[in-house]
């Protein structure tokens, strides 16, 4: 049960990584958006559990985009009162398609990322052995936001987070 809860919460946290991938229509714009990821982003989020009070958490995400804008490596460290995460994520960007893999180091969880670019950001599916969650991402130059809703709301109803770089 703990792994299931941690898997669901971690899937939500992974969404933060995708926040920095701003929407783009042309290849040149995509390179600029991916290059803009580089650096440290920090912010706050809230987990709304299936029952009980919401929990706030702090998060720092560092992005390492490739020069050609087709790959992004992300390091994620987040901490709340009851949750702590340390993860790495690798994304591939091919036109409007996003694929990738993630690994959470504390709880030994792994999974895949798949999704598509939309006009405002992304709709992404996070998959793992213990969860599946749909994520809606909206991004601007200095601020990133994400809403994650698990397919099964047994442990969590929603996660919402905001990060800033500027």
Region annotations inferred by a language model:
Residues 9-22:
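Bacterial N-terminal signal peptides
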């Amino acid at each position: 049960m703990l792994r299931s809860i941690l898997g669901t919460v971690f899937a939500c946290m992974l969404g933060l990584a995708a926040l920095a991938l701003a929407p783009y229509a042309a290849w040149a714009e995509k390179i600029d958006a991916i290059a803009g990821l580089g650096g440290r982003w920090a912010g706050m989020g809230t987990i709304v559990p299936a029952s009980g009070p919401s929990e706030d958490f702090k998060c720092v995400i560092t992005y390492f985009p490739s020069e050609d804008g087709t790959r992004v490596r992300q390091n994620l460290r987040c901490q709340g009162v009851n949750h702590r995460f340390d993860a790495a994520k690798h994304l591939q960007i091919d036109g409007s398609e996003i694929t990738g893999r993630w690994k959470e180091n504390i709880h030994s969880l792994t999974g895949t990322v798949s999704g598509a670019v939309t006009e405002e950001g992304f709709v992404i599916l996070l998959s793992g052995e213990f969860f599946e969650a749909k994520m809606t991402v909206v991004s601007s130059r200095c601020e990133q936001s994400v809403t994650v809703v698990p397919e099964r709301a047994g442990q969590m109803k929603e996660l919402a987070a905001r990060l800033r770089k500027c």
